[in-house]
Structures are given as C-alpha cells and as structure tokens.
Amino acid sequence: MTAAAASNWGLITNIVNSIVGVSVLTMPFCFKQCGIVLGALLLVFCSWMTHQSCMFLVKSASLSKRRTYAGLAFHAYGKAGKMLVETSMIGLMLGTCIAFYVVIGDLGSNFFARLFGFQVGGTFRMFLLFAVSLCIVLPLSLQRNMMASIQSFSAMALLFYTVFMFVIVLSSLKHGLFSGQWLRRVSYVRWEGVFRCIPIFGMSFACQSQVLPTYDSLDEPSVKTMSSIFASSLNVVTTFYVMVGFFGYVSFTEATAGNVLMHFPSNLVTEMLRVGFMMSVAVGFPMMILPCRQALSTLLCEQQQKDGTFAAGGYMPPLRFKALTLSVVFGTMVGGILIPNVETILGLTGATMGSLICFICPALIYKKIHKNALSSQVVLWVGLGVLVVSTVTTLSVSEEVPEDLAEEAPGGRLGEAEGLMKVEAARLSAQDPVVAVAEDGREKPKLPKEREELEQAQIKGPVDVPGREDGKEAPEEAQLDRPGQGIAVPVGEAHRHEPPVPHDKVVVDEGQDREVPEENKPPSRHAGGKAPGVQGQMAPPLPDSEREKQEPEQGEVGKRPGQAQALEEAGDLPEDPQKVPEADGQPAVQPAKEDLGPGDRGLHPRPQAVLSEQQNGLAVGGGEKAKGGPPPGNAAGDTGQPAEDSDHGGKPPLPAEKPAPGPGLPPEPREQRDVERAGGNQAASQLEEAGRAEMLDHAVLLQVIKEQQVQQKRLLDQQEKLLAVIEEQHKEIHQQRQEDEEDKPRQVEVHQEPGAAVPRGQEAPEGKARETVENLPPLPLDPVLRAPGGRPAPSQDLNQRSLEHSEGPVGRDPAGPPDGGPDTEPRAAQAKLRDGQKDAAPRAAGTVKELPKGPEQVPVPDPAREAGGPEERLAEEFPGQSQDVTGGSQDRKKPGKEVAATGTSILKEANWLVAGPGAETGDPRMKPKQVSRDLGLAADLPGGAEGAAAQPQAVLRQPELRVISDGEQGGQQGHRLDHGGHLEMRKARGGDHVPVSHEQPRGGEDAAVQEPRQRPEPELGLKRAVPGGQRPDNAKPNRDLKLQAGSDLRRRRRDLGPHAEGQLAPRDGVIIGLNPLPDVQVNDLRGALDAQLRQAAGGALQVVHSRQLRQAPGPPEES
C-alpha cells in the first residue's frame, strides 16, 4: 500500500496540476463577488460536485468497460451523447487553452518586454505567444507518452503555485491582515455573485477529462483507488483556492481584479512568480491538449472508435496526431491573441462547456447506467442550473466582465490610488505649498491653474481675511504689474505697507494707484497672494521673439509676471502663493521653474509671457500708472509688442478692467481670469479679457483688492515662513539648477564680457538682450523718453531685459546665483541684507530727506533739460566718468563689487526713500526698470553702468545711489525684509547701479547696450561697460557687501549730502531708485539725479534718462 500510495502521488500531482490553472488567478475576484464565507462554501460545494461527477465516470467506466468519455456517452446515449460529450470536451479544452494563452500574454509580455527592452504592445504579445507555442507547448504536446513526460513538469509547476500562495499570504500581511482594517472593507455574503462565480469555480475544478485516462493508467484500476486519488487532489486544490481567494481578497479588498497577479508591484519576487506561473501554464498545456486531441480524433474518425474501447492513449496515426496537435496549439493561440480578457473566456467556457462536461454529462451517464442515484440527480440539476442561469448571467456580464473586473478591481484600485494621491497632494499643497508650487511650475504651464488655485486658496485665505487693506495693496499690486510691463517705475506704495512684507509692499504702488483709480488699476496679483517681488520678476518685458518662445511657458511665466491678465489668462492666480514664496524664497521656487530653462529661460519665458500679457494688460491697464506706459508700449514695440502695448499703455481704463480680476480677486475673478486665460495668451485675447475684467464691478474689485491687500500683509509674513520652508526643500534643486544656469549664463557672459562671469539667470538674458540690442535699429531715445509726457521712457527691451536679468537673479537669489552658491547662501545674504537694509532704511530715509533739500532734487527737471543737464553736469563734474563708464567699467568691477554691495544697499535705501514702499513692492519690476535705467545710465555713463572702475565714478554713483538707492533701499529694505528674493533683486539693482551687479548689469547692460546702440556714441560706452561691468564676482561681493552695505550706505549718504544739495551724484549707471515716488521729494530727487546723470554722461544719459523718465512718470503724476 505504501508503494501504491507513493505511486499515487504522481497521479495526484498530475491531477492537481491539471486542475490548478488560470482559474486560481480569479479566486480573489470570486471571493469579492460572493463574499468570503459564501465563496468558501461555494468552493467546497463545487469540489464535492466535481468529486461526485468523477466517481460517476469511474463507476460507469468500470461497469461498461469503456475507457473514454465519449465511449461512455455513446454507450449511454448513442451517437448523440457521444457527439455532445466530444463537442463539449473540445470546447472546454479549447477554452482552457485560450485562457492559458491569455494569461501567458498578460504575465509574460510585460516581463519579457522589459527584459529585452521592447515596448509592451499587441505586436510583442503576439510574438511572445507564438514563441511560447512553438518552443514550449508544441514540443510537449507532440509527445505520445504525455503522462510520463509531464509529471516532472507538473511537480515543478506546483512549486510555483506554492510560492504564489505564500506571496499572496505575505501580501495580506503587508496590507494589514492582523490590523483588522479589512474586516470592515470586505464582504462576507453576496448572493448576487453566486451565478457569476459558480461557472468559474466549476471550471477551476474541471478534471473530468483526466479521469478516464488516469483510471486507465492505473496498474490495478479500482473505484476505491480512484476515489482516494481524486479526493486527495480536490482537497489540495480546494485548500489552495480558499487560501488564495481569502488572502488575495483581504490584500486588495474591493480593488481586486480578475488577474490578481497584476496587483503586485514589479520586483524580483513578483516577476519571478509571474514567469513561473506563466511557465506552469505553458507546461500544463499538454494536459489540456491530450483529451482535446483525443476528442477531435474520435469525432472526426469515429470509425476507429466504434466500440469505444480505445484508451485515451490509444494509437493515433502520426499524420493525424501531428495535424490535430498543430491545429489545437496554434488555433488556441489565435484565440488567445484575439481574446484579451481572462475572465470573459473563463466565464463563458465554464458556464457552457464546463457545466456540460463537469456536471451534466457525468450525471446523465451515471443516471442512465445506474438507475438509482440520488446524488446524480443533485449534480444534474445543479449542472443544468449553472448551464442556464450562469450562461445567461455570463452573457449579460460578458461585455461588462472586462469592464467590471477592470473597473471594479483595477478601476477601484486606480480610483482609490488616485483618491489617495489627491489627498496626499492636498496635504502636500497645504503643508508645503511651495513644494506644490515647484512641482506646478515644472510640470505645467497648463496645470499651474489648478495648483495655483490650490495655493491661491492658501494664500487667499489670509488675503480674504483682511478685505480692507487689500483694496489698497491690490491696486498697488496692479501697479506693480504695470511696472512689470516694462516700465521700471518702482511701486512706492508697495513698500508703504510693510517693508518686511515684500509681497504686500511690492503689490502696493501709491504713485500708480494715484495715477490710476483702484478700480481702473489692475488688482495686483500680489493682493491675490503673489509676492510683489515675484510680480516684478514676472513683469520684466521681453522681446516679442523671446515672448513667443516663452509663450508656451506663459502658463508658468504668466503666473509670475504678476499681471492680472497673465494670471487670468494662465489661471495662475493660485500660483500667487507659490510666487510669494518665490519672492521670499525666489531662488527656491523660481529657480525650479527658471532652472527648467537654460539660465533665464524660465524667467524670460515668464517675463515674456507676462510682458506680452502685462504689457498688453499693464500698458492697457497700466497706461495711467506709468504714464510712462506709452514708453513701455514703445519698449514693448521694441520687444515686438509696440502696437498692443503702446495702445494699451495709452488706455488707462483697460488696466483697471484687466487688473481687476488680477488682484487676487475671489473665485469670480478667477473664473473671469480663466475665461480671459483662453484668449490671454494673445494680445487680442488679453484685450477681450480686459473687456471681461471691465464687466467686473469695480466696487467689488476694489473691495476684494482691499481685503486682499490686508490679507497679503498677513500672507507676506506667512509666505516668508513658507519661503523659508520652501527654500530648504528646494535648496538642492535650486542649487543644481542655479549651477546649470550659472554655467549657461556664464557662457553668455563670456560672450558678453570675456573677463566677467555673468549670473546664470542674467547671462543668457543678456546675451539675448545684446543680440536683440544689436539687431534692434538705433532709435532716438529722446522721443521715446519723452513719450510718456516729455519724460524719456526706457525701451521695453531694455527694461525687459533688465527686468529679466534682475528677475533671473531675484528668482535665483541674485547674489547667490552668479557664484552658483546654494540658495541658502543667498537667503542668508538676503537676511543679512535685510537686516542691513533695515538699518539702511532709516539712513536712506535720512538721505531721502536730504535729497529733497537739494534744489535740483526738489524740482523735477524737464525731460529735455534732464536729458541734457544731468548728463552734462555729470560729464562736467565727472568728465572722466563718462569715459570711465565706458572704459573704466571693468575697473569699476573691482570696486564695483563693493560698490555693488554697498550700492545695492544704498540704491535699495534710495529706492525705498525715492520710490517708497512701492519700490519694494514693485521691486521686481521697479528693479528691472531701475536697473534698466541705471544700466542705461551706466551704459550712457559707460563706466557708471558697470562698476566703479574709477573710484570717483563709484563715488559719483554712490552719492546718487545713496540718494536714489537710499530711497530705493528704504523701500527695498522693507521689501527685502519682506522678500529675500526682492532684496536680492534690489541687491542686483544695487550691483547694477554701483558695480552693476553682474546679474543686474547684464540685464541693465543689455538694455543699456540696446540704447547705446540706438545712440551712436553711448552704444560704444555701453558695450564697453557691459562687457567690462559684468562680473559674477559681484554676486558674492554683494552678499558679503550686504554686511558692508550699511557702512557703505552711510559713507555714500555722506557723499550724497553734497550731491543732493548741489548735484545728484552722477548716476554712473548705478541709479536704480528712480522709481515713481508718491512723494514730490522723490520726483525732485529723480530730477536732480537725472540732471546730474545727464551732466556726467552728457548725451549718453539722455537714453538712460528716458528710462528714468519712464520710471519717473509715476511720481510726477503722483505729485
């Protein structure tokens, strides 16, 4: 008996292997459909029915002496029964083989495609199935003694099934089997799934085709032995199925799909499991082909099977044997290629052929031969019920089965996964809005809308809380947007709110607010939650060519420009918070986006997109704000947007309309912005958006702006905190990007200044700006300067470039990026600068107070007079400076670094004093404008723009910087306090003004270069100054000098005293603080500065003065 039992284990193994197949993959799904309890009971019931049906066949065979299924059917029901059994057997075997191929294609295609580097697809799947059929299935199927050859493979296949079961168990443990969470998520009884699962369960136990061959292969055939063999086999299979179904269902609960293997993540274990399962299925093919081929042979050649006594392994002519084998193997392969769903083929086959072969036919045969068999009645009726009900159910579900399995299981999984991802994303956005912003900026110009909305909500939440103050800040922010158009006019009121809060201050522009009614003023995005500094960064106008290039990035770029239109069009308002953190931690946030592009690409595309939108909207909406708006229009014209920008610049009402949705308005403005966003990418669409904005109630917009301004103040503090977190998070990213950008910009600088390395963000822009300048035909700057009312308006290209360059450093932590240092250094420098600037702010205030005292400072010199007078005076007072500006720019680089640091701080103070808080809020734009002006002045005063090659020039700059930069610093310091990025921007400005920080000098120099080129003589000086003035070293000096800025500012303030009284310190291209100041003193200061600069630079300063005039128009209007 022991030997017999041992020999029986080989048969048991074969039977188990023939039973276990692709159906095991559907067990968890069936448990989900029926519930754990009902599913287990159905499995046990189907196992019992299968055992009974097998015993029916064994007993019938022992009584009738027939050894084939078809022979028993012929013996019981004649030819009809034989035909029914043969066709059912053929259909069952073919369906099973098709299911095998489908599983092989599903499990093998992914693995082998990745293994060999192919793309998973229908072609590769077809190739895989063909290879498996030709190399594995066919050789095994062509063997005549299949039982002996397959046993070894059966044992190997069972090993994979065992491993599969343990993997399922471990998966359930991993998914919290003992935590008990699944108890609430699983179902225990679902009667509606019974008729969907019984066919699959019946198919999963289908082994009737192996009963008689196994019985015939026994040395001593007996019913008892067969009963024990099949009982053992079915018990093993039932246990296996219950374990797989239970643990698989617990692991994936309602997300369970038909093929549970597809749930597992891709790793070595699961991949080996899939391959092993695929191989076991391939090896199991011969077990299915054997009865199928025999049934086909008896069906086609029944004359040889007349008596039905031939055993299943009976002799078959070689030709027929091979033909039938090939037809079955490749026929089922075609079916496997055409039918991609395992559940569909198993359900249909099990409900029809499976029920006939497994239950109905054995019960009918046994009932015919054994007259009294109650069990046969039960099995028969169950089989008939399965045949009828389950077939109808399966057919009705057949179309849905793939969808249900895919949707309910994979879809459920995907839905849950997506839900979890959304929840996590929401958490991340709430916890780390900056991180979300960085991701948004990178991933999408399109997605920014949703992300912006999320972050806007975060920022707007506080913005909405202060509804009163936001009204002021929002219009001011809109004004900042206008400077961003290309007008370098600093926003005075942007700083007035709270210098430490860069966003609010940047947003606020009293001068622009005064110029344009708050209603007309585009509600600043800063009020909407954007950092004013970010707006300034976004504001820098770019040439049309650059804008077009960057328009695809406008989704991201438009966000930063801080234009209501850009935000509306791009739906970027939600990004305002992101931008706010960028302003505070601009190097972190913007570098992520900017770093996307080479150097300033990110910046340029955004400023350009913003410029196109902002110049259209700001020129349209900011025409009043910077009645230098027409000059920006002209500048825009230079950039390629002259018509729209200039036209809009002349239209003050439009800005009010467009900006209205921009100032971080409630969701309604956002919707309007979204509407405008559709056409916002184009100037015409922007105009339409402006019209839409007009439709918004100005009262509502003003109220919202006020609220947003108040909220922005609060948000500024919050944003600074967020910026710190964001900066930390993005330090590495920004550092890497900054390094890349530095490398690229440095290359640009190498072209620009062979001896000076230019900041990353500015290097590329300067190269572009210079190219644009070179390409641009020389244009008389005087008319342009006086375009906005007799005052010279800097060309937008210059402003844009200066803004871009300044924006690049701002986004990149201007001081830090040139060195490629991590943002943390710029941030630390910014913090230091902020502290220094805080000290310098009062100093700047004092200097500003002193400045108005000067007769020249108080009166605002006429554009023409200033154009000639300051330059002439500068030339007279510093006859060598104009030359030094051109020739001594490189010399200035050395002191310029120090001067850049000190000048930056001084300029920032001067800007603060001159521009007031608006300078800070408008710093990004103001800075670019000032930088462009200063750079233009520096270009005009070739030595002054780049750096104090000659210290007297530096001194000249320093007094002016002290006056202007003191005013700017007053605002800038507050703004720096508010925005580290803005501080750096102003630092860059200071660098541009004094040493012309290589970042700023580049942008300013590009602008200056363009203007000088337009001006025959100044161009040379500017070009000289530009190549010589640019130095990456300024970045570190700026950072280091930030500490020195206080002392330098003090010293320069002393120097400024005489300059302010007598002559404004000649602007060696350093004057950055010519921001439109709400105070008359600022205008006087600007006039005096312009006069001095013009005196020093002579004709060259006229171009710069035009820039100054553009910036200045705001203050005169304010005055």
Curated annotation (Swiss-Prot):
Family statement drawn from the similarity comment of this UniProt entry: Belongs to the amino acid/polyamine transporter 2 family.
Gene Ontology molecular function terms on file: L-amino acid transmembrane transporter activity
Residue ranges of the TM segments: 4-24, 36-58, 84-104, 120-140, 153-173, 229-249, 272-292, 323-343, 345-365, 378-398
Any single GO BP term: amino acid transmembrane transport
Alphabetical keyword list: Amino-acid transport, Membrane, Phosphoprotein, Transmembrane, Transmembrane helix, Transport
Domain of life the protein comes from: Eukaryota
Compartments, record wording: Membrane
A GO cellular component annotation in the UniProt record: membrane
Catalytic activity: L-glutamate(out) = L-glutamate(in); L-glutamine(out) = L-glutamine(in); L-alanine(in) = L-alanine(out); L-serine(in) = L-serine(out)
Function: Facilitates bidirectional transport of amino acids. May act as a glutamate sensor that regulates glutamate-glutamine cycle and mTOR signaling in the brain. The transport mechanism remains to be elucidated.
Compositional bias per record (Polar residues), positions renumbered to this chain: 880-889
Residues recorded as bearing Phosphoserine in the entry: S612, S802, S889, S965, S997
Protein name: Solute carrier family 38 member 10
UniProt topology in membrane: Multi-pass membrane protein
Source species: Homo sapiens
Phosphothreonine modifications at: T772
Pfam families named in the record: Aa_trans (PF01490)
UniProt-listed InterPro entries: AA_transpt_TM (IPR013057)
Region (Disordered): 438-691, 731-1071
Biased composition, class Basic and acidic residues, residue ranges: 439-454, 466-475, 493-522, 544-559, 592-603, 668-677, 731-752, 763-773, 832-841, 863-876, 975-1005, 1012-1022, 1033-1042
Record gene name: SLC38A10
Pro residues composition bias: residue spans: 652-667
